Amino acid sequence: MRDRLILLPGWGLGVSPLEPLAAALRGLDEHFRVEIEPLPVLASTTLQDWLDELDATLPDNVWLGGWSLGGMLATELAARRGERCCGLVTLASNPSFVSRDDWTSGMPAATFELFLGGFREAPNTTLKRFCLLCSQGSAEPRALASQLLGGAPKAQPDILLAGLELLGKLDTRSALQAFNGPQLHLFAGLDGLVPVQAASDVLALLPDVEVGLIEQACHAFLLEAPHELAAAIQGFLHESGDD
């Protein structure tokens, strides 16, 4: 089913941010199936539990993709499935959201720990702050943050906390290197959560994959530039289909 793409959303904000991109992709090719699958509702912080849930839910032999945490999970699932996955598309998705000694293009660990502590203390306030960080770099950050927050589902704090802790633990570099299918990784030049250096570092890690940069865009570039993203994804899918 090379004409089918499953997209996974990022942390805490539900499927709404991906809907404009899905609509733009369908508009470019009415025969191409684009579906958005919600993240698993799990209180576990163990990656295997999340992958087991996704592997049981999502069809085989499709393209896998996702935004931020969703892209990281799509990467891990693609590596698990191998030839049962047509290819991988990630959007503003850092192989390691948090900086490590050998991956410095992430959020400083101390900053992430403060954010995690803030969520434990005041989840609603911290989610609002997260929306502002997602929209940092946008021409209208507050309006975009309000749109993100307005579309977010009412999730239980313990479920959100588990997802946030997983985000802080994940390091998908081995999975990226293990997956031999076609890969496209798109980044935003004004991203307040994923440093732009991550794009160069991904290309250095994976010299044979496609890496793109939407320069004047924030982390929530799904809402800022859905048609530009859709055009890049469609071009990549067509090229991969011709190989």
Identify the role of each PLM range:
Residues 217-230:
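Catalytic histidine-centered segment of alpha/beta-hydrolase-like enzymes
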Residues 120-170, 174-175:
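Conserved alpha/beta-hydrolase catalytic His-Asp/Glu region
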Residues 66-70, 74:
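Gly/Ala-rich beta-loop-alpha elbow adjacent to hydrolase catalytic centers
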Residues 1-47:
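Conserved HGGG/HGGXW glycine-rich cap/lid loop of the alpha/beta-hydrolase fold
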